[in-house]
């Protein structure tokens, strides 16, 4: 067991409380720089896929009969205004009867078109094309397949040819979601309610955490998280309650038997679910698999350096977002070398080609962005901290890549604003709680900045005193942040009951 670093070793205070009194962020004890669809049928008597969603509108005088919600209780805003799209960074347009009718007049949508109304990514057409293929597959009866592993409802999403192209994790089927199809967390809640959930995380924000981790990864230039965004999908293989399925069957029956009534429905089919969609990566294995092999058969020096560089990027990502669920089974390694299958002698020996590559994929980022440091039962440690790679000091390559960004406070402020635009789309968004999440992240960035400057190793990084960097009430709110009075720091000294370092 590694003992947690005591901030009292180098800071004033006795550490008996939860935190020391706030001090000005520019005190002498703090580093000088804080952060340096077309019509699908000729008539209304079309045959519908069981899991498809269809919106019907007779004319501009059609009556919108209802606005349904998906399993998570969130409104399914399926009729955007005349602008045509709803981006994560855009404010939600006021939905009046006039603009809802004008946007849907004389359109007979194909199955699944209602979820497609949300899934517009003009800034990333390649990702949008992948989502379109996923929607087409569902329309054609190639439904997502539930993943057996894990404690939540997550699904392999396929293209029309049946090839896996992504992993979809609906909000309503998260580990503590009310429509989670797996019983593990239900028994946890019933049998051990005192330990239910993670007290440092906001419930049911896993899908946002997944997408936000991808955003942080891109902003820092790490490129180890498969691209992840928030999308809306509907499929009969998702877990819906009995009422939603009964309503879907009733509406489809009414549409087929009584078209005049059926065409007045806002949507026919199951409601789309909001969740995170992460691109599927091929050729990767769990880290445990390769780490054991690398231990038995050491890598050549150039490959070892590549692995160390990729590992350090994983450390940077996990530390900044304070991932509370990083084991060696939810990050992946891909080792590429020529001649696989062609070696006839000494196949167990590693080759040393120039075009070989080791890559890491950081998946399962849904339990990150806590609003406080873990201080109750468990510490939720980073399991990579016990690997031999964690004992090696951060390389110059990593310092050159990351330090110039996180040392710039305006870069950090821009990152917080981008995360705000993403998180505010959630129905249960709380600005106060979000600011607490950002305070933890700023503290993590502060520690990482100092560790990179001091040439520390990942294991030394996780042993640094935990810091929360909060915006001062008197601090400015503009984009250009002044260091003098913008933030204050607090050392978080309360330890979890079970500590890991």
Swiss-Prot record:
It is a peripheral membrane protein. SUPFAM superfamilies: ADP-ribosylation (SSF56399). Residues 362-382 are annotated as: Activation loop. Residues 182-195, 285-293, 377-386 are annotated as: Important for interaction with membranes. Keywords: ATP-binding, Cell membrane, Cytoplasm, Endoplasmic reticulum, Endosome, Golgi apparatus, Kinase, Lipid metabolism, Membrane, Nucleotide-binding, Transferase. Belongs to the PI3/PI4-kinase family. Type II PI4K subfamily. This is Phosphatidylinositol 4-kinase type 2-beta. The gene is pi4k2b.
């Amino acid at each position: 067991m590694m003992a947690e670093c005591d901030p009292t070793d180098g800071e004033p205070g006795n550490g008996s409380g939860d935190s020391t009194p706030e001090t000005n962020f520019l005190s002498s004890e703090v580093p000088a720089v804080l952060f340096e669809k077309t019509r699908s049928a000729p008539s209304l008597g079309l045959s519908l896929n069981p899991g498809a969603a269809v919106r019907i509108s007779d004319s501009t005088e059609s009556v919108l009969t209802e606005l349904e919600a998906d399993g998570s209780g969130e409104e399914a805003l399926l009729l955007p205004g005349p602008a045509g799209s709803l981006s994560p960074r855009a404010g939600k347009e006021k939905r009046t009867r006039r603009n809802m009718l004008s946007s849907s007049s004389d359109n007979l949508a194909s199955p699944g078109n209602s979820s497609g109304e949300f899934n517009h990514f003009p800034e990333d057409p390649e990702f949008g094309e992948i989502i379109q293929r996923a929607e087409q597959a569902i329309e054609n009866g190639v439904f997502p397949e539930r993943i057996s592993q894990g404690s939540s409802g997550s699904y392999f999403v396929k293209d029309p040819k049946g090839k896996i192209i992504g992993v979809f994790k609906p909000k309503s089927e998260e580990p503590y979601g009310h429509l989670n199809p797996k019983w593990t967390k239900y028994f946890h809640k019933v049998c051990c309610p005192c330990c239910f959930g993670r007290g440092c995380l906001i419930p049911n924000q896993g899908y946002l955490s997944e997408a936000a981790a991808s955003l942080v990864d891109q902003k820092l230039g790490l490129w180890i998280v498969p691209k992840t965004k928030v999308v809306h999908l509907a499929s009969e293989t998702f877990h819906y309650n009995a009422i939603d399925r009964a309503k879907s069957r009733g509406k489809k029956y009414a549409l087929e038997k009584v078209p005049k009534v059926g065409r007045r429905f806002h949507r026919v089919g199951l409601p789309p679910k909001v969740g995170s969609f992460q691109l599927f990566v091929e050729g990767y294995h769990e880290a445990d698999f390769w780490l054991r092999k690398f231990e038995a058969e050491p890598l050549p020096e150039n490959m070892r350096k590549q692995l160390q560089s990729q590992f350090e990027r994983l450390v940077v990502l996990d530390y900044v977002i304070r991932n509370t669920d990083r084991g060696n089974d939810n990050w992946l390694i891909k080792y590429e070398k020529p001649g696989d299958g062609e070696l006839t002698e000494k196949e167990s020996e590693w080759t040393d080609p120039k075009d070989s590559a080791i890559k890491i994929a950081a998946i399962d980022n849904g339990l990150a962005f806590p609003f406080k440091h873990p201080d109750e039962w468990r510490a939720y440690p980073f399991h990579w901290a016990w690997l031999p790679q964690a004992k090696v000091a951060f390389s110059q390559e990593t310092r050159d890549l990351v330090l110039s960004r996180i040392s710039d406070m305006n870069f950090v402020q821009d990152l917080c604003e981008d995360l705000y635009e993403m998180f505010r789309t959630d129905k249960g968004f709380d600005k106060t709680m979000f600011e607490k999440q950002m305070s933890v992240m700023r503290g993590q960035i502060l520690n990482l900045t100092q560790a990179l400057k001091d040439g520390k190793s990942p294991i030394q990084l996780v042993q640094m005193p935990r810091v929360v960097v909060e915006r001062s009430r008197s601090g400015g709110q503009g984009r250009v942040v002044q260091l003098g009075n913008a933030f204050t720091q607090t050392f978080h000294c309360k330890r979890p009951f079970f500590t890991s370092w």
